[in-house]
Regions:
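Phosphate- and other anionic-substrate recognition elements at nucleic-acid/protein interfaces
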Residues: 118-130, 136-140, 148-151, 155-296
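Long, highly charged, low-complexity intrinsically disordered interaction regions
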Residues: 243-341, 360-387, 429-455, 464-468, ...
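Conserved, well-folded catalytic cores of nucleic-acid-processing
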Residues: 60, 72-76, 93, 129-133, ...
Length: 540
């Protein structure tokens, strides 16, 4: 088996009389590659082509070598009358039974490894996408593009609440440019819109051109950004969306979702099946159970890493907080509906919303902003409040000083080892407390690159070889990365063009959401595609 694995080739052929209309599998019509060197994405592509009936797939290797090997093992006397029968039996049993079994095993192992790799890539991309920095303190206008049915507009405030809904018809067949322009400008003036979020679906580029022209006549500075709307339509038609906006059409809910994706990606994306978000590679070709487990873990990890505002968090995001059950989430929302808000973390246990055990597990991930206790807005666990108070008192500070320059300076000058003994706390917990006191409102997403805002349109015809551009990494796959440079289709940077040093996988250098400087390597106008390089002055 090992010998076959190390010395065989995967050979693919296009089946006769089969139509591959879009030529998806063109590179595999007459293709061969050593099994041991075959990349995961090619294994999964070949598997899909075979499953769809386009490709025939086989393993080719020296079977005569295998027969000879087995003959030497099994035939002790070449001159025996039985030798010929044994040789025939070896060939027959290998062709009918042993060979196909070994080949299936090898392909199964290849597939399993490739699926694990695809799931790992998807999980990493998803985590980086979920941790996209939120667009804080901005009034946002969401735009769900369309032709015949019109573009749906939704205004949301700083907290994500929907303020207004409109429909405009700037494109075919109505072409009501002036009427649509007036509606957009009126919304900008009325709500002091800062940013317009445009979905990247049908009519996206036409809508971008329309908005770029409109904002030139706005009375205030307005930018726009193209937002990945993958999965937005799924959410908009879901039970959850209907419960939240029962009187709105699907497309209107979609416009709200697009705006919220820009404002707080994590809170909005948790409402959608992770597989619909579109940052994976061959996710439909892997075992669903394994994929779901990996993605659920990533979502839970991301939510708990960021934390939630207990007074605004939806049930969709609360369900990922460690320790919370469906029943406890219902109690939290019921309390908010009856009393308006929580004023402290303690109210969760004082009102018997959470048991002592669940409270201990979950409370460190839940925040109360503008509450009665300033520590409730930090990631400090209530069980460490007494030690935190001692620390503050020992340096002459109090809760009112959280995040101030004076407190930061004093905390920078303390001896960690000495203070851990003085207030009887381990060094790691003390360091976490100090970091939280320095930045009580810290959001780990702020460490990531901010989305690129635009004010004008870029067309593929504008691109020239060697041109320097700024782009956002939208997807990372085994063979490279797709980068949004502001044209209709994302540009592709091949793994060989990412860096001038050797890397095994693009994820060693790039992550979804990264803002990168890239260079146009080649433009394919007929296909609407662009090849990019991250290597300056790349002459390869």
């Amino acid at each position: 088996r090992n010998d076959i694995y190390n010395n065989s080739k995967i050979v693919t052929k296009k089946k006769k009389n089969v139509v591959d209309e879009k030529k998806v599998y063109e590179m595999y019509y007459d293709y061969s590659e050593d099994v041991k060197y075959m990349k995961p994405h090619r294994v999964l592509a070949v598997n899909r082509g075979e499953k769809e009936g386009v490709l025939s797939v086989s393993l080719e290797y020296n079977k005569e070598y295998i027969y000879n090997y087995l003959e030497k093992k099994l035939i002790k006397d070449e001159n025996s009358e039985c030798a010929t029968y044994v040789k025939d039996a070896i060939v027959d049993s290998y062709k009918r039974l042993i060979g196909p079994s070994v080949e299936r095993e090898i392909r199964s192992e290849l597939t399993e490894k490739s699926e694990e790799g695809a799931i790992e890539v998807f999980a990493k991309n998803l985590e980086n996408y979920l941790l996209t920095p939120p667009m804080k303190d901005k009034m946002i206008l969401g735009l769900d593009p369309a032709y015949r049915t019109g573009c749906k507009l939704a205004v949301i405030d700083y907290t994500g609440q929907m303020l207004d809904i409109k429909v405009i018809y700037p494109h075919e067949p109505k072409n009501d440019f002036e009427g649509s322009k007036k509606i957009v400008l009126d919304l900008i003036d009325k709500y002091n819109i800062d940013v317009i979020a445009i979905g990247n679906g049908t009519a996206s580029r036409e809508s971008e051109t329309f908005i770029a022209n409109v904002i030139k006549d706005a009375k205030r500075s307005v930018s726009y950004i193209i937002v990945n709307e993958a999965g937005a339509s799924v959410y908009s038609a879901s039970k959850l969306a209907i419960e939240e906006f029962p009187n709105l059409h699907v497309e209107e809910r979609s416009a709200i979702s697009i705006a919220r994706r820009l404002q707080d990606p994590l809170s909005e994306l948790v409402k959608i099946d992770s597989k619909s978000i579109g940052v994976g590679q061959y996710q439909h070709d892997v075992k669903e159970k394994n994929l779901n487990e990996a993605l659920d873990f990533v979502v839970s990890k991301s939510v708990n890493n960021v934390g939630v505002n207990i007074n605004t968090a939806s049930a969709s995001i609360l369900k990922y907080i460690s320790g919370l059950t469906k029943k406890s989430i219902e109690k939290i929302i019921d309390f908010r509906n009856k009393h308006g808000r929580f004023n402290s973390r303690n109210e969760l246990i004082d009102n018997k919303i959470l048991s002592a055990k669940v409270y201990e597990q979950s409370i460190g991930f839940m925040r109360v902003l503008d509450g009665s206790n300033p520590l409730d807005k930090t990631s400090i666990h209530p069980e460490s409040y007494d030690k935190t108070t001692k620390l503050l008192e020992s340096i002459g500070m109090n809760y009112d000083s959280l995040g101030t320059e004076e407190l930061v300076k004093k905390l920078d000058n303390i001896d960690i080892d000495d203070y851990s003994k003085k207030i009887d706390i381990d060094i790691y917990t003390l360091e976490d407390i100090i970091n939280s006191l320095k930045k009580p409102n810290r959001d780990p997403r702020d460490d990531f690159d901010k989305p690129i805002l635009k004010s004008d349109v870029l067309h593929i015809e504008d691109l020239k070889k060697g041109m320097e551009l700024e782009g956002t990494v939208r997807n990372v796959v085994d063979f490279g990365a797709f980068i949004d440079i502001g044209i209709k289709n994302d540009g592709l940077v091949h793994i060989s063009k990412i860096t001038d040093r050797y890397i095994k996988h693009p994820s060693e250098v790039l992550s979804v959401g990264d803002i990168v400087t890239c260079y146009v390597d080649e433009v394919f106008l007929d296909k609407g595609k662009v090849a990019l390089s991250l290597i300056k002055n790349d002459e390869k």
